[in-house]
Amino acid sequence: MASTGRIPLWLIATVGGTAALTVVGLFFYGSYSGVGSSL
């Protein structure tokens, strides 16, 4: 396990998870709306 320094691991996991869910959500929403192909 690498040392994260001042940044707690749970914070990285929370931000990373939220960002991943947002990207996936926008991808499916864009595909459903018909504009996902333009991305």
From Swiss-Prot:
The gene is psbJ. One of its GO terms (cellular component) is photosystem II reaction center. Pfam families: PsbJ. It is found in: Plastid, Chloroplast thylakoid membrane. The keyword S-adenosyl-L-methionine does not apply. Belongs to the PsbJ family. PSII is composed of 1 copy each of membrane proteins PsbA, PsbB, PsbC, PsbD, PsbE, PsbF, PsbH, PsbI, PsbJ, PsbK, PsbL, PsbM, PsbT, PsbX, PsbY, PsbZ, Psb30/Ycf12, at least 3 peripheral proteins of the oxygen-evolving complex and a large number of cofactors. It forms dimeric complexes. One of the components of the core complex of photosystem II (PSII). PSII is a light-driven water:plastoquinone oxidoreductase that uses light energy to abstract electrons from H(2)O, generating O(2) and a proton gradient subsequently used for ATP formation. It consists of a core antenna complex that captures photons, and an electron transfer chain that converts photonic excitation into a charge separation. This is Photosystem II reaction center protein J. The chain crosses the membrane at residues 7-27.
